């Protein structure tokens, strides 16, 4: 056992099984070295959490890692196919960022992780100033819930990391924030990129 702490974020395929994501998170919570928690308190989604990374001395937060449940599919076809990060999650992010800044007496830099990309990813892909593969259109929600704007306003998120589109593994920038894809994993997933 390598004793490496880990965290998970949920995406659209996690709701396709007969097991609710709340049960999946409860199972994961019992695993050694899991650090995923659940924001609770009316924040929509499962596994939204902020993970502080302490500095070398252990007396202050050096970075915050924000994990968001990007949900799955919308129930209203007039709003597109994919669901979106909800207002309660955006409000939670702002509150947690402000709380961390007050506690640490500075704006703590952060990274954000979620499965389904926000609409700004497609804008970055079309700018052609990316590094990596841009082999498919970004499949993001039709509705823009303002998460990226909140990142810009808070001025703490330095990069976002998503999955979802298996033929993309690019990195681009918008408003000083890196928008990054992780490369697909697993042997049963679609796509042309090498595993």
Predicted segment positions?
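A cross-family glycoside hydrolase active-site/sugar-binding cleft signature
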Residues: 9, 113-115, 182
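Short, solvent-exposed loop/turn and secondary-structure capping segments
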Residues: 18-21, 77-80, 122-126, 173, ...
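Residues that line or immediately flank small-molecule/substrate-binding pockets and catalytic motifs
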Residues: 13, 164, 183
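Binuclear metal-dependent phosphoesterase catalytic core
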Residues: 50-55, 59, 147-149, 154, ...
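Short secondary-structure boundary/capping segments
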Residues: 24, 126-129, 177
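His/acidic metal-ligating clusters that form di-metal
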Residues: 2, 64-67, 79-169
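Extended active-site neighborhood of metal-dependent phosphoesterases/phosphodiesterases
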Residues: 2-105, 156, 187
């Amino acid at each position: 056992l390598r004793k490496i702490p880990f965290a998970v974020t949920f995406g659209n395929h996690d709701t396709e099984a007969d097991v609710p994501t709340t049960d999946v998170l409860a199972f994961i919570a019992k695993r050694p070295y899991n650090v995923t928690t659940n924001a609770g308190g009316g924040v929509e989604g499962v596994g939204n959490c902020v993970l502080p990374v302490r500095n070398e001395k252990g007396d202050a937060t050096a970075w915050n890692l924000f994990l968001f449940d990007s949900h799955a599919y919308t129930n209203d076809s007039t709003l597109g196919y994919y669901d979106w990060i909800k207002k309660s999650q955006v409000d939670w992010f702002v509150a947690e960022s402000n709380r961390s800044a007050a506690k640490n007496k500075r704006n703590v830099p952060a990274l954000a992780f979620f499965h389904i990309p926000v609409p700004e990813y497609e804008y970055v892909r079309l700018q052609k100033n990316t590094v990596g593969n841009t082999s498919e259109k970004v499949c993001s929600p039709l509705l823009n819930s303002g998460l990226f704007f909140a990142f810009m306003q808070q001025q703490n998120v330095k990069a976002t990391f998503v999955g979802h589109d298996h033929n993309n593994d690019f990195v681009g920038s918008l408003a000083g924030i890196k928008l990054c894809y992780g490369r697909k994993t697993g042997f049963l997933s679609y796509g042309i990129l090498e595993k």
